[in-house]
């Protein structure tokens, strides 16, 4: 479970790659908000994506929210997971881990908002290092040998063609560096 945000999803990619290397025949499912699903790696790294639509959920009344959770519980139970890994470590991910039907639940060391009551926190030797290393500590706990940090990005060939077509259409040539000077939170704009 790693539902958001963009940077957090990208930081989790090396964990997903290490998990796939450790368990090459496992079926690995990722639970994510739909707006970030395009950054979840394609097969063979991730086999299936389950969506939790936070935008839609936040617009629901209480009864509709309960129905949404009942449906999500049914879906998660139907998967019969052997292990649930909560890489989000927040209340919302803890609830989803709890209703998954899987009793074997772990998460990375920095679990907050009560998520540590639902899943076992896995802390490794990189607790003071970059979050990527802290996520990889969970993979190491599961027996992965992390020799290099890999970022299994999804196939972006269609997007590449689209950008190339737009550059040609606008008669722009050469190499470019694209800068997106923005952030979702004001505190992250510097």
Model regions and ranges:
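Catalytic machinery of carbohydrate-active enzymes
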Residues: 1-190
